[in-house]
Amino acid sequence: EGGATISASEYFRRLCQKITVALSEFTSEGYVYRVDLRLRPEGAAGNIAYSLDGFERYYQSRGETWERLALLKAWPVAGDRALGRRFLEMARPFIYDQPFDLKALEEVRGIKRKIDRRMSTKQQGRGQRARNVKLGAGGIREIELIVQTLQVPYGGRTPQIRERNTMKALGALRDQSLISAEECETLSSAYVFLRDVENKLQMVDDAQTHSLPIDGQELTACARRLGYVDNELSAAAEQFLRDYRRHTGQVNRIFEDIFGASEPSRFSQSIR
């Protein structure tokens, strides 16, 4: 810009912002995907671009439990792959080697309580909150929390469970006897079902929604996109809601059994 020089940090901040716009801007051809930059050190108030040393200093001094969970999904997808691998190596001790005690478990419970409060504010009434595929009771986020909160404390000495893919991680947790075969089957089946529901909801107008329609016709249309059909016994929407409640109910029961606030939970006993 007119021969002016800028710092490397400022250069990469601007570059990241432009890439984010290019990926998430909605055009006549749609968009690539939505980008959320809030999952970075200091959140929305933090720098967009950090040096590797900057990341390491932050994680060693101020890293939080939720960031340990989030980093389980980290993977280099573009640019300098060698630098990406160095980042993963740097982050590994922060994820797996720090203690995961009852305080950390309470922080995970706090994450869930925060989600529940936000849902209560956005969607009044227990019935409406239950219709949120991602954040509602027994939804996608509870499955992910189950997986990630087991991976962090046990992944240090059991590298077999360090899987980024949720379905593969569930199988690995089963193989290491951290969840039962029945729990693995229940959670895997629910995860596939709920992700399918999420996709069918969002394919309409590329909407970023996770809530089941309230309107009866829209709910029926969603059920039919999922393959449900009316029969002599029940309508497509009724069949879909029955399966939805079964899956989410089973997930929530497993979540509460492992991490529930009532002590002693199954997980709290294992980390004492």
Regions picked out by a protein language model, each given a short descriptive name:
Residues E1-R272:
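A nucleotide- and high-energy phosphate-metabolite-utilizing enzyme signature
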